[in-house]
Amino acid sequence: YDIVLTELGGTVGDIESLPYVESVRQLRWELGREHSLVIHLTLVPYLNAAKELKTKPTQHSVKELLSLGVQPDILACRTEHPLGIDIRRKMAQFCNVETSSVIEMIDAETIYDVPLLLLKERLDSVVISKLHLKDTKEPNLTSWKNFLGKLKNPLHEVKIGLIGKYNELPDA
């Protein structure tokens, strides 16, 4: 394989995830920075009372990762509001990553918007650059955009019956 993606779920520092974080640390040590990449997915909450995004939770989770021997290369920041350049610079400075490596992952209307949002944020370019990959041709997303257009602008309405234990939850 040219690239292997591995997701570690959970919260940094939880006892359940420690063996997996240690595996990432060891793998990073064996492969080196030029052949491995750590993307840290983090929440940047918006406090309505203060009308501001809070970066402290991200700073603390990165600090915890660092204490376990893992330095993220990219911060993928889940957020309800756009990350301004000042917020990006602040997170870059306090989390020891490049400003271009602070990627906004703003809440999307549908999960199918996410690839286009990440392309807009240039995540692909950052990954290609950090891994020193040669093939940098532009992706052809015409089919994806057509699919997304049909999804967002349906021609017909279909009623679907759903049977299940937890289907009343909003995210079901």
Residue ranges and their predicted role:
Residues 1-2:
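Short, high-confidence coil segments that cap the C-terminus of an alpha-helix
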Residues 5:
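Generic enzyme active-site microenvironment
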Residues 8-172:
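N-terminal beta1-alpha1 cap of cysteine-dependent amidohydrolase-like domains
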